[in-house]
Design a protein with these regions (language model features):
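Active-site catalytic microenvironments in core metabolic enzymes, especially phosphate/sugar-handling
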Residues: 1-238
């Protein structure tokens, strides 16, 4: 099986043409005709990730975030990114990134968050023109929960003791919106769609004021919101 076979398979759930314009997705390093000996799935391609791939004899890394994001003018190992890229090249390890192509997938990052939270009847929060792709998801809890109980449930679900949240509204939690990664841009959409709670990451201080008592905003952390992406990719590839 070649890298192209794997990339074609990944593009069935995360077509590259549905990635955001600013992003850098697809095969970043390597030749698509290369035979795949082993695949390492990761959230970020760190130097330790490449070392692990070498140790485990994996010549393809499937990463959520792209190690090459804004472009490189030189690859001489002077910066961290260059060092990682150079090590991958020297060891004939290809790197493929999905990032916002998977973010915009109906079965992508936010869908996995819904699954972990046990939401039902969920659909895309910010659908694109085709209606089948877009950022975030919104769905229902099987049973309503008190906000305090939902906050505890959220911490447990995302395996963290530290979350940030806006002032509780005093309402029961029925409808929940989620968006993996940085999601402050969708706060107004979550409110418009009558979500009781919006879970995402990287909210700034003043973003919490946008709740205006209409919604409970929860910032679980960037990594925490995307941590299940590895599971999603492994499940799809195996």
């Amino acid at each position: 099986m070649t890298i192209k076979n794997i990339s074609d398979y990944l593009e069935e759930i995360a077509p590259l043409n549905q990635a955001e314009d600013f992003d850098n997705v697809g095969l970043l390093i390597g030749n698509e005709t290369t035979e795949v000996e082993g695949i390492l799935v990761t959230l970020d391609t760190l130097e330790e990730t490449v070392d692990e791939a070498i140790k485990k004899k994996c010549n393809l890394i499937v990463s959520f975030h792209p190690i090459i994001f804004s472009g490189l003018k030189k690859i001489n190992g002077n910066s961290y990114v260059e060092k990682v890229v150079l090590k991958a090249i020297q060891n004939n390890i290809a790197i493929y990134a999905t990032h916002t192509a998977l973010d915009n997938s109906k079965v992508g990052v936010s869908s996995k968050m819904c699954e972990k939270l046990g939401l039902i009847n969920y659909n895309i929060l910010l659908p694109k023109e085709d209606g089948n792709t877009g950022m975030g998801m919104i769905g229902d809890l099987p049973k309503p929960m008190q906000e305090e109980d939902f906050l505890k449930f959220t911490k447990k679900t995302f395996k963290t003791n530290g979350i940030r949240f806006s002032n509780p509204t005093g309402n029961l939690v029925n409808k929940v919106a989620v968006l993996g990664g940085s999601g402050s841009f969708a706060i107004a959409d979550a409110i418009h769609k009558k979500a009781d709670v919006y879970i995402s990451a990287d909210f700034k201080y003043h973003d919490f004021f946008k709740a205006e008592g209409k919604i409970l905003l929860i910032d679980v952390g960037h990594y925490e919101s995307e941590q299940f992406t590895k599971n999603l990719l492994v499940e799809y590839l195996t």
